[in-house]
Amino acid sequence: MAEQIVVLRLGHRIPRDLRVTTHVCLTARAFGADGLILADVVDTALEKTILDVCKRFGGSFWIRMGEPWRQAVKDWKSKGGEIAHLTAYGIPLPEAMEAINASPKPKLVVVGAEKVPGEVFEAANWNVAVTNQPISEVSALAMFLDRYFEGKQFSKEFENAQLRIIPSAHGKKVVNLTEHND
């Protein structure tokens, strides 16, 4: 397993993709990714939302914006990292995961919002298909990260959290960790 896993979000269109890209970020964070690069654009509303979640619920997830995707891919590969591109046209997820998990190199997971340029398919070490059918990038990312982390994300502790959700069969329970009970 790699020491670092980062998501590269391609094709984000402001304001059209705000909700879906927010969900890509939330999924990446909750399922154990270190951070997300939002390629080619800066979306301050998205950044504010994600940083607020990180502040309240903890963790060290980061978001970087505006970097041209070609540069992000080039820099990642030049530092010895590998790229897994999530697409309907790739190798089925179960077949790809053995090789992906066996490599200790940092991983960049590419998810698109609109048609992904052919260059991404060429640059990727793995073009990974979740079902070989049209699918939401949010669900594809969740499936990929679940297989990648082999379920370990379910016991992950998020450091410096202000709030913690307590599992409950009925109702909602949230504990404010900043309040002191004397």
Set out the residue ranges of the language-model regions.
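SAM-dependent methyltransferases
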Residues: 1-4, 30, 155-182
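Short, flexible active-site-adjacent loop segments at beta-strand->alpha-helix junctions, enriched
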Residues: 89-90, 169
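Long, charge-patterned amphipathic alpha-helical coiled-coil/hairpin "stalk" segments used as oligomerization
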Residues: 90-130
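Short, glycine/charged-enriched secondary-structure capping and boundary segments
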Residues: 21-23, 51-53, 97-101, 123-126, ...
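RNA substrate-binding interface of SAM-dependent RNA methyltransferases
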Residues: 1-88, 145, 149-154
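Structured adenosyl-cofactor binding patch, chiefly the S-adenosyl-L-methionine
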Residues: 120-172
